[in-house]
């Protein structure tokens, strides 16, 4: 996929939603000059959270170096002012040093401009360069996103196989009843077998394509994976090279590692273990663990031992760790309904194997025991890292601290969205807007007629015959799992519309079903209002639509203090204008009048339409910027096929645990914002991400 979405541009924020106001941190924050028009372009699924390809970030949260997206276009109202600096600015980048390349700390920037969020002319800021280095943290996130993409692809393949097998089964039953005769061998043996798990197929593909992040095993910590990192399956650990076995509890180096830099060690040696209650003899006292060796127990039943364990392979590897003083990575598994495997795995840090022995286990068979002690000086697992496992998520609105509004939607949404404020004194609720559930259309905007739909009945299942599937590149963009998940980002997603023969349960209507997660709007000290979910959100799941008033861009008053304008620039992205990279997931664009007008070139550089959420909007207006966001933007077409009027949807870029703030990258080009005096404006970023670029623009 391309490195940038470029699907929509955002202009700043006022009282309710964007970080533009929040940089000052408080109700008294001064709104930026009303003559400004800021542009923000959202990154792609591959780059949204970790800022890929054209923009990479360092894992060190204290770094004063910055990174910025590729220089992007701005609105026509700013082009004249920016023209003298354009050629210079388009080449500028901010250098980011990786952990191993971190230079001397720069002097802390003067923050006298914090009340407005702007940077004073005298303040020292990092200089822009062309050097950008990708951090280990970013590489881990990219790899997990790649795994999720492969996983969802094979989920779709399994769904197809199941549909085909069910059809063959029905045909076979009909033949037996004499309804019709089927030829011998109609029911293929391959279709009657249990399919290989999609996650294991994804790992096989990643291994074949050499996409495993750290394919060679190593002692100690894995770069980019800190204590508290959570994996939503054993397969995710394999994908990044953290633990190379999707089933065994002990990962170890075999004899093949006895050469080279490990020639002084006696192999095998253990590198990681998983504690997840697989053995009846395990004892766990947090800082000290008695771990039972592997082998001889019932994997699929009650986990009881049925034969003696043998001191070989993983068991021998842990014994050798005692004798050679080699620490192992310890991962703790917890039951979690949100994970497709029923568990979630949290990295607890490095442990030293201090002792081993053999004894008769509870079931009467010989087992090997290992005493492990946690190494000192490591960060502890904090409450916010495990709170969703231990039930800290509020079960009802009455349990919320700092409640200032029980439902900001006024009952319009099926699920109430409360607002909380533990920052202001006295606490205040979000104001200055009217909540609306769906797009409102300005009087002078005429929507296209409904597009001709597919002829599917009930639900679309056959991508070869469904006309909507063909528009998406001959297959459906979603899978059924978890209520519908987008496999990967596309230039635009074509969903089934009002003239299609399928019903509301069709998988190709996934983004049309409204909000399905329990959200909360909460006040932050530095960024104003923010949004989080009480529920786990899987990668690829639709989160919400950006809702407001659909207007012509030329009708937006440049002098008004409205900073919730979201330009619909899907067409500009698809045409690759202004140096934007096009995605590999090309789609078939239907011929519509709006794309054939002879004067179409006039709107190539500036989108014709925008969504104004200033006075009317939904929960999306409260979602903040982050340099490492967990959401991405996707243009969607359903009722019509005019790309210039596409719906703007926010999807989960990662598996998002409960209570984690929802964010996406506003995508400013560095030094792209000019004030009324023609000078470049600068603003600090307070997103708090480890790879924060320090400047919003």
Regions found by a protein language model. Give the residues of each.
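Compact mixed alphabeta submodule
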Residues: 338-396, 656
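C-terminal interaction modules of eukaryotic adaptor/scaffold proteins
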Residues: 650, 658, 662-697
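Intrinsically disordered, low-complexity acidic/polar tracts
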Residues: 373-376, 381-483
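Catalytic cores of histone-lysine modification enzymes
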Residues: 509-639, 644, 654
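Acidic, glycine-rich low-complexity segments with interspersed aromatic residues
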Residues: 111, 115-146, 150-346, 444-448, ...
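Extended, intrinsically disordered, low-complexity regulatory segments of metazoan chromatin-modifying
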Residues: 2-125
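Short, Lys/Arg- and Gly-enriched loop/turn segments at beta-strand edges
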Residues: 337-344, 550-557, 670-681
């Amino acid at each position: 996929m391309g490195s940038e979405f470029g699907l929509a541009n955002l202009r700043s924020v006022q009282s309710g939603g964007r970080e533009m106001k929040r940089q000052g941190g408080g109700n008294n924050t001064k709104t930026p000059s009303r003559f400004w028009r800021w542009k923000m372009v959202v990154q792609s699924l591959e780059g949204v959270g970790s800022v890929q390809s054209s923009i990479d970030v360092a894992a060190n949260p204290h770094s004063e170096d910055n990174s910025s997206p590729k220089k992007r276009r701005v609105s026509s109202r700013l082009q004249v002012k920016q023209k003298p600096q354009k050629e210079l600015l388009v080449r500028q980048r901010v250098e980011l040093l990786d952990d191993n390349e971190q230079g001397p700390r720069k002097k802390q920037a003067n923050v006298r401009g914090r009340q407005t969020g702007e940077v004073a002319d005298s303040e020292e800021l990092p200089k822009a360069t062309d050097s950008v280095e990708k951090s280990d943290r970013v590489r881990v996130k990219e790899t997990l996103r790649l795994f999720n993409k492969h996983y969802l692809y094979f989920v779709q393949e399994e769904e197809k196989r199941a549909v085909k097998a069910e059809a063959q089964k029905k045909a076979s039953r009909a033949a037996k009843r004499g309804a019709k005769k089927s030829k011998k061998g109609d029911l293929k043996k391959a279709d009657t077998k249990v399919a290989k798990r999609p996650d294991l197929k994804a790992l096989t593909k990643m291994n074949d394509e050499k996409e495993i992040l750290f394919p060679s095993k190593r002692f100690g910590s894995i770069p980019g994976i800190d204590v508290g990192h959570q994996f939503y399956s054993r397969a995710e650990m394999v994908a990044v090279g953290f633990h190379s076995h999707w089933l065994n509890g002990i990962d170890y180096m075999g004899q093949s590692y006895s050469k080279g830099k490990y020639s002084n060690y006696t192999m095998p040696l253990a590198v990681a273990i998983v504690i997840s209650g697989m053995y009846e003899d395990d004892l766990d006292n947090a800082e000290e663990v008695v771990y039972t060796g592997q082998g001889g127990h019932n994997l699929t039943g009650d986990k009881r031992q049925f034969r003696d364990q043998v001191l070989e392979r993983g068991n021998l590897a842990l014994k050798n760790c005692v004798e050679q003083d080699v620490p192992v990575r310890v991962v703790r598994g917890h039951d979690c309904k949100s994970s497709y495997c029923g568990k979630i795995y949290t990295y607890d840090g490095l442990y030293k194997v201090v002792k081993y022995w053999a004894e008769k286990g509870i079931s009467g068979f010989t087992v090997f025991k290992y005493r492990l002690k946690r190494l000192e000086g490591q960060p502890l697992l904090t409450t916010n890292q495990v709170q969703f496992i231990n039930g800290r998520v509020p079960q009802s609105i009455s349990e919320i601290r700092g409640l200032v509004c029980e439902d900001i939607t006024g009952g319009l949404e099926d699920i109430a969205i409360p607002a909380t404020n533990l920052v202001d004194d006295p606490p205040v609720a979000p104001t200055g807007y009217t909540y609306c559930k769906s797009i409102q259309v300005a009087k002078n905007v005429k929507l296209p007629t409904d597009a001709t739909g597919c002829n599917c009945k009930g639900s679309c299942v056959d991508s070869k015959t469904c006309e909507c599937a063909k528009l998406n590149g001959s297959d459906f963009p979603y899978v059924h799992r978890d209520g519908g998940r987008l496999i990967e980002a596309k230039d635009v997603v074509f969903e089934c519309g009002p003239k299609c023969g399928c019903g509301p349960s069709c998988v190709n209507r996934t983004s049309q079903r409204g909000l399905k997660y329990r959200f909360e709007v909460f006040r932050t000290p530095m960024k104003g209002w923010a949004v989080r979910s009480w529920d786990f959100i899987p990668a690829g799941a639709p989160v919400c639509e950006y809702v407001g008033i659909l207007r012509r861009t030329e009708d937006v008053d440049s002098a008004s203090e409205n900073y919730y304008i979201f330009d619909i620039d899907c067409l500009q992205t698809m045409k690759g204008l202004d140096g934007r990279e096009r995605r590999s997931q090309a789609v078939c664009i239907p011929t519509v009048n709006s794309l054939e007008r002879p004067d179409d070139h006039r709107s190539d550089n500036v989108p014709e339409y925008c969504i104004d959420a200033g006075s009317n909007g939904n929960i999306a207006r409260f979602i903040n910027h982050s340099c490492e966001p967990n959401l991405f933007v996707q243009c969607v077409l359903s009722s019509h096929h005019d790309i210039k009027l596409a719906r703007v949807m926010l999807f989960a870029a990662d598996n998002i645990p409960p209570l984690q703030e929802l964010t996406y990258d506003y995508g400013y080009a560095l030094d792209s914002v000019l004030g009324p005096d023609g000078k470049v404006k600068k603003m600090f970023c307070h997103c708090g991400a480890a790879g924060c670029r320090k400047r919003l623009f």
